[in-house]
Amino acid sequence: MICHNQQSSQRPTIKTCPGETNCYKKRWRDHRGTIIERGCGCPSVKKGVGIYCCKTDKCNR
C-alpha cells in the first residue's frame, strides 16, 4: 500500500506501508484551525475527529 503521509503544515510526502491494507485521512479543529493528518492504516479516533479510510494506493489525498 502506498499512502500520502503528512500533517497540514508539512509538505506532501508518500510512504510505502508494507502489510497495510488501508490509508487514512483525519480532520479536526483546534485553536490553530482545521488540522488534517494523513497516513497508513485506519486508526480509531476520539469523538470530534473525522476519519476517512480507503483501500487503494494514494487514495487519502
UniProtKB/Swiss-Prot annotation:
Location, primary (coarse class): secreted
Disulfide bond residue pairs: 3-23, 17-40, 42-53, 54-59
Top-level taxon of origin: Eukaryota
Tissues showing expression: Expressed by the venom gland.
Pfam families per record: Toxin_cobra-type (PF21947)
GO molecular function, one term: toxin activity
Record key words, sorted: Acetylcholine receptor inhibiting toxin, Disulfide bond, Ion channel impairing toxin, Neurotoxin, Postsynaptic neurotoxin, Secreted, Toxin
CC per GO annotation: extracellular region
Bilayer-spanning residue ranges: none
Subcellular location: Secreted
Keyword Secreted: yes
Protein's UniProt keywords contain Secreted: yes
InterPro entries registered for this protein in UniProt: Snake_3FTx, Snake_toxin-like_sf, Snake_toxin_con_site, Toxin_cobra-type
Family: Belongs to the three-finger toxin family. Short-chain subfamily. Type I alpha-neurotoxin sub-subfamily.
Role, per record: Binds to muscle nicotinic acetylcholine receptor (nAChR) and inhibit acetylcholine from binding to the receptor, thereby impairing neuromuscular transmission.
Protein name per UniProt: Short neurotoxin 2
Organism for this UniProt entry: Naja nivea (Cape cobra)
